[in-house]
């Protein structure tokens, strides 16, 4: 209300979970738009944020949408961004080009794929390398269970004709440090080789 903004937006925080059980939150940024990661919030709250944003823009209120109370989070969700790029053993990220000859995303209970790939697609390296987002939902609030489900979904994603970061993502999702949340913001840099 103080800034006169009446729509959906994104507030980002970094959480530092210390060994003594305390958590420290650091504010990163606020965006007057949805971020690409909004799908995780949709899965754990059951609220279609894009539809809600459109309805608010058309003049509806949160009361009209039945959203006067903060939705209860349920379960656990993870999103994996499938990029048309490879990650070298030294951590260098390289763009991938070529004609997409096969695009067969995973599906099933608790698996959602948002993407735009199709056989015959010729991507340009002049734009963002994002090809798809695989979002998995676990009804149980278990990070490890959701991680394993995400890894399984990525193992079923069939993409041919260009390289993606799926092998890297699968490696991260299977890593014990990752599964036990024993990571920091430097973890990928320190473990890429």
Write out the residue ranges for each language-model feature.
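ATP-dependent carboxylate activation and anion-phosphoryl transfer catalytic cores
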Residues: 1-193
């Amino acid at each position: 209300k103080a800034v006169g903004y009446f729509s959906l937006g994104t507030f980002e925080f970094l959480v530092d979970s210390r060994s003594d059980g305390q958590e420290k939150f650091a504010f990163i940024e606020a965006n007057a738009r949805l971020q690409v990661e909004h799908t995780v919030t949709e899965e754990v709250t059951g609220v279609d944020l894009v539809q809600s944003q459109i309805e608010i823009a058309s003049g509806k209120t949160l009361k009209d949408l039945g959203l006067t109370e903060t939705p209860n989070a349920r379960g656990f969700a993870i999103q994996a961004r499938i990029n048309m790029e490879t990650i070298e053993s030294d951590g260098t990220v390289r763009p991938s080009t070529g004609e997409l000859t096969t695009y067969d995303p995973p599906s099933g209970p608790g698996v959602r794929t948002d993407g735009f790939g199709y056989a015959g697609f010729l991507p340009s390296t002049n734009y963002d390398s994002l090809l798809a987002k695989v979002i998995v939902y676990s009804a149980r609030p278990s990070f490890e269970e959701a991680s394993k489900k995400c890894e399984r979904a990525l193992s079923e994603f069939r993409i041919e004709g260009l390289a993606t970061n799926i092998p890297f993502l699968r490696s991260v999702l299977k890593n014990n440090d990752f599964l036990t949340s024993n990571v920091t913001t430097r973890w990928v840099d320190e473990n890429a080789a």
